[in-house]
Amino acid sequence: MGKSKKAKAKRADFNKQKLKVGKSKNAPNNFTDTSFRTKTLVLPTQAALEKEDFNTTAKDQAYFAHLLGMLKHHNANQRQETLEKLTQYVLSHTSILTTSTALLLKLTSPLILDESSSVRDCLYRFLEKFIYIMGPELLEPNIGMIFLYTHSGMTHITPSIRNDSTKFLSLLINACKDRLSSSAISLQWKKTLECFTNLLGWNSESASVKRTTSFSKKSSANMIRHLTVCNDFLQLGLNPKLQAKNQQSSVHLKYPYLQQCIVIHPKYEAFRSPCSFAYLSLFNPNKHDLVDNPTFRWQTIYPLIPGIIEFIRNSWSDACPVVKDGSNSPSASKVCRTVLSMLGLFTEQVFSVADEPNNHRKKISQVLRKINRDIELININYGTDSEWRGVLKGYDKLRERAVELDALENPGK
């Protein structure tokens, strides 16, 4: 009898239980009741916590980090909108320009190579507003980042990016001219010249010029800007007058009163000449001293002179309207003024140095004589035009200086 009860008990585990009508299934032994409800607790001081200063600062920092991250968004419209919001944010939080200058320029400079023209235009407006607000001591160490992407844009495979690159270079040149020391442009001198070589098409090995640029009556505004920015760059690096002005406007910390107050230790004289510490290069000129001088810049551009002179000649021939056919364009006079400015710079440099080779002088003299003949025709055909009167005045100054330097022999012929 006992065995039958045990057998029934074992089979009961596998039998399907038949429930009576109206009764629910029995709850298991490990059942947990979850039918209870919770109530929220509201503190009377909870609203005051959201208005504290540390929460506002944290929100601003998070918003700024969010904007910087959105600069890499895949959508061009989103990148443009982010730049506009970032502009408004920096205008309302100008301390960002002091505390996060390197980070800001590091993340915005790559947009120079952005495929969207609207993003590049928005970036140009952004840099145009803030590059003159940043302190020179903060801008100069970080301006190389903008130069890096500008050089990449000048040699970019996309024509639209290539055309917009000189807009950013013009901003950098104006910043270096007005607020920074000459070393800022000297460190970028060689690379920028190489980029202009590819952009404008002059050859560094010979006097041949790739006719990739044409400044005729149908010349584009982009190529005119390339030529104008190139002239500004050369003037800033080679013109002695601009260099003297640049040194006056740059930031140099001078303390003349220290010369009267400093007491020199007697053993200091032992370290004024290179001795056992020579391997440390403590007494050698640094990189800025080596490149920040007109001699270095002239030696760098020297191999490019034949190609540049030929480029100047071709640009003048393309833009100069020697025949009055009614198709004169305002862009032609701008090109001619810029060409005369560039030619005057190289005339001053080549003819003021006694040991310059004769072939460079001959090429410049030939270009001057050609321009002198064309100027006579311009005076006859367009002498009453205000735009061309500026060209005629510019040539008169160049002619006077060329005669002083014996660069223009027999100017009447």
Swiss-Prot record:
Sorted alphabetically, the Gene Ontology BP terms of this entry are: rRNA processing
Gene Ontology terms: cellular component: heterochromatin; nucleus; rixosome complex
SUPFAM superfamilies, alphabetized: ARM repeat
Q: Keywords of this protein's UniProt record, alphabetized?
A: Nucleus, Ribosome biogenesis, rRNA processing
* This protein's record includes keyword Electron transport: no
State where the protein is found: Nucleus
Query: Could you tell me what this protein does?
Result: Component of the RIX1 complex required for processing of ITS2 sequences from 35S pre-rRNA.
Family statement drawn from the similarity comment of this UniProt entry: Belongs to the IPI1/TEX10 family.
What does the subunit section of this Swiss-Prot or TrEMBL entry state?
Component of the RIX1 complex, composed of ipi1, rix1/ipi2 and crb3/ipi3 in a 1:2:2 stoichiometry. The complex interacts (via rix1) with mdn1 (via its hexameric AAA ATPase ring) and the pre-60S ribosome particles.
Protein name per its UniProtKB record: Pre-rRNA-processing protein ipi1
- Tell me the name of the encoding gene: ipi1
